[in-house]
């Protein structure tokens, strides 16, 4: 039982972040749990927790979800997941991960800058196919497409609450595609994986509910700054991790 205290604390922290911002759980949970368990097992466990937690958060904010954006992204996400499945067998993941970290950090830093008198035009809808493809590839290769989802939706959705509500729904769809591939490859058949999931799923749900309650008391401007700041931290974390691995 004591062996689960550290994992439970890591999961609680990660899903409080998810409850507040709508994304970021994997970038908190995966590095911490990887200190204790093998990384492939951690990624599978985190995706299983993400599906439950993201569905819960999406249900709490269902009226604010922009399903039109999900429909635009879905074809690209499916194609990207298939491409990622092929790339995962033949590609060294270090350089695309470094590029992803640089991109995400740059998007977050740019969004934190004072807005000009004339706001930037939103990203054009036809680019959703490319954005969905990138999300599918990254989720398949790394299991951490959340920052990329936020980077796209923040250019499409001016309402920060719609952004926060729509992000976990998109993450759920991308995570499910990865889990289907993992199940086909036999990576979800270990009994220990499901034992850990049963022990931690309640902690994750509690973290989501706690973060959701705190988010109600945060102004839209502060919430946008928090989301963009987390983008910067997420990107820098990916960069440091990649350089250390190299």
Regions found by a protein language model. Name each.
Residues 4-71, 129-137, 146-203:
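Small-residue-rich hydrophobic segments that form or flank transmembrane alpha-helices
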Residues 22, 38, 92, 159, ...:
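A helix-boundary/kink motif common to multi-pass secondary transporters
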Residues 44-47, 100-104, 108, 168, ...:
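Residues within membrane-spanning alpha-helices of integral membrane proteins
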Residues 50, 77-81, 104, 171, ...:
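Residue-level recognition of pore/gate-forming positions within transmembrane alpha-helices
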Residues 209-232:
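Interfacial loop-to-transmembrane junctions
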């Amino acid at each position: 039982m004591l062996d689960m205290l550290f994992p439970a604390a890591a999961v609680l922290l990660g899903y409080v972040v998810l409850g507040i911002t709508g994304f970021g759980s994997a970038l908190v949970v995966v590095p911490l749990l990887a200190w204790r368990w093998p990384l492939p097992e951690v990624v599978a466990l985190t995706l299983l927790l993400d599906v439950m937690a993201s569905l819960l958060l999406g249900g709490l904010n269902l009226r604010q979800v922009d399903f039109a954006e999900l429909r635009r992204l879905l074809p690209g996400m499916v194609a990207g997941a298939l491409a990622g499945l092929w790339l995962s067998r033949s590609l060294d993941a270090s350089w695309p991960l470094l590029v992803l970290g640089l991109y995400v950090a740059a998007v977050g830093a740019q969004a934190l800058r004072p807005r000009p008198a004339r706001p930037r035009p939103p990203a054009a809808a036809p680019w959703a196919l490319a954005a969905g493809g990138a999300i599918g590839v990254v989720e398949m290769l790394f299991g951490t497409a959340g920052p990329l989802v936020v980077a796209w939706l923040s250019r499409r959705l001016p309402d920060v609450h719609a952004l926060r509500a729509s992000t976990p729904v998109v993450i759920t769809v991308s995570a499910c595609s990865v889990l289907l591939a993992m199940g086909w490859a036999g990576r979800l058949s270990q009994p220990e994986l499901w034992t850990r999931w049963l022990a931690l799923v309640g902690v994750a749900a509690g973290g989501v509910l706690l973060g959701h309650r705190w988010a109600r008391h945060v102004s839209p401007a502060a919430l946008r700054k928090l989301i963009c700041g987390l983008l910067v931290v997420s990107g820098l974390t990916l960069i440091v991790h990649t350089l250390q691995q190299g």
